[in-house]
Amino acid sequence: MNILLANPRGFCAGVDRAISIVELALEIHGAPIYVRHEVVHNRFVVDGLKAKGAVFVEELDEVPDGAIVIFSAHGVSQEVRQEAKRRDLKVFDATCPLVTKVHMQVARASKKGTKAILIGHEGHPEVIGTMGQYDNQDAGIFLVESVEDIAKLPVSSQDDLTFMTQTTLSIDDTSDVIEALKEKYPAIQGPRKNDICYATTNRQQAVRELAKQSQLVLVVGSKNSSNSNRLAELASRMGVPSKLIDGPQDIDPSWLDGVETIGITAGASAPEVLVQSVVEHLKTLGVTGVSNLEGCEENMVFEVPKELRIHEVK
């Protein structure tokens, strides 16, 4: 029995940046540092930051006035930003720059009075933050999760209409939704290419190749990680059994019955140390070989805020 590792896998530039922001803030200012929402959707990462003194909260009313707070990689609404300013909170913003790019698209649409349609998953923190960039009551922003939702849209005119997407969606599903939107609203405007980020795109492509050569695909990632879920779904759609796992403790040995090659990948918020712990555990269950699938190289780096960057250099 062999293991085939997907490439690329694991941390993306936005996740690296978000974790660095929390760690540097703790190093400079000391604990406690408050973080609104899980800074990235991975239990192992969050538990590690908690151990260093990070305090994770869901809303700003849990943060003392004047304290330091970090916004998660998923971004926040304008209302949250205004509340932080009103309460004199010191903010370090760990919003992924690629999410911020979508925020700016929504804010521009709001300012122009252009109706906006966001393709995304209801209730996901990124979607809540992105929807919260729109404040034009005369137009409006509407959420679409699937092709079926398009028929329910309360939008009759295609004039001054634009769409955006969450950054961590299924490429195939999103393409179907965009195609259906353009069929119903031929004049709808949108980004030149969808807003799905490079890391999501690369990891989904890697899983396609992985699934072709595996009888089982394990995706290392937490249950609340959107991009990790999409990886597991993609492998399943290709006819390969797939499991989303937090770590080796989640592996059921019966999954390995009749399997010759186990494909392993990791969501953009899952650290490589978890992948290696899964590999080591599988070796105790009969794996004898480990190889890497060739894939594209990622060189993207996002800088931390200037105040933290100066300290990092020192």
Curated annotation (Swiss-Prot):
The active site is at residue 126. GO terms for biological process: dimethylallyl diphosphate biosynthetic process; isopentenyl diphosphate biosynthetic process, methylerythritol 4-phosphate pathway; terpenoid biosynthetic process. Isopentenyl diphosphate binds at residues 41, 74, 124, 225-227, 269. (2E)-4-hydroxy-3-methylbut-2-enyl diphosphate binds at residues 41, 74, 124, 167, 225-227, 269. GO terms for molecular function: 4 iron, 4 sulfur cluster binding; 4-hydroxy-3-methylbut-2-enyl diphosphate reductase activity; metal ion binding. [4Fe-4S] cluster binds at residues 12, 96, 197. Pathway: Isoprenoid biosynthesis; dimethylallyl diphosphate biosynthesis; dimethylallyl diphosphate from (2E)-4-hydroxy-3-methylbutenyl diphosphate: step 1/1; Isoprenoid biosynthesis; isopentenyl diphosphate biosynthesis via DXP pathway; isopentenyl diphosphate from 1-deoxy-D-xylulose 5-phosphate: step 6/6. CDD domains: lytB_ispH. Keywords: 4Fe-4S, Iron, Iron-sulfur, Isoprene biosynthesis, Metal-binding, Oxidoreductase. Binds 1 [4Fe-4S] cluster per subunit. Gene3D superfamilies: 3.40.50.11270, 4-hydroxy-3-methylbut-2-enyl diphosphate reductase, catalytic domain (3.40.1010.20). Dimethylallyl diphosphate binds at residues 41, 74, 124, 225-227, 269. It is an enzyme of class 1 (oxidoreductase). Its cofactor is [4Fe-4S] cluster. Its EC number is 1.17.7.4. InterPro entries: LytB/IspH (IPR003451). It catalyses: isopentenyl diphosphate + 2 oxidized [2Fe-2S]-[ferredoxin] + H2O = (2E)-4-hydroxy-3-methylbut-2-enyl diphosphate + 2 reduced [2Fe-2S]-[ferredoxin] + 2 H(+); dimethylallyl diphosphate + 2 oxidized [2Fe-2S]-[ferredoxin] + H2O = (2E)-4-hydroxy-3-methylbut-2-enyl diphosphate + 2 reduced [2Fe-2S]-[ferredoxin] + 2 H(+). HAMAP family: IspH (MF_00191). Belongs to the IspH family. Catalyzes the conversion of 1-hydroxy-2-methyl-2-(E)-butenyl 4-diphosphate (HMBPP) into a mixture of isopentenyl diphosphate (IPP) and dimethylallyl diphosphate (DMAPP). Acts in the terminal step of the DOXP/MEP pathway for isoprenoid precursor biosynthesis. PANTHER family: 4-HYDROXY-3-METHYLBUT-2-ENYL DIPHOSPHATE REDUCTASE. This is 4-hydroxy-3-methylbut-2-enyl diphosphate reductase. The lineage of its organism: Bacteria, Pseudomonadati, Pseudomonadota, Gammaproteobacteria, Pasteurellales.
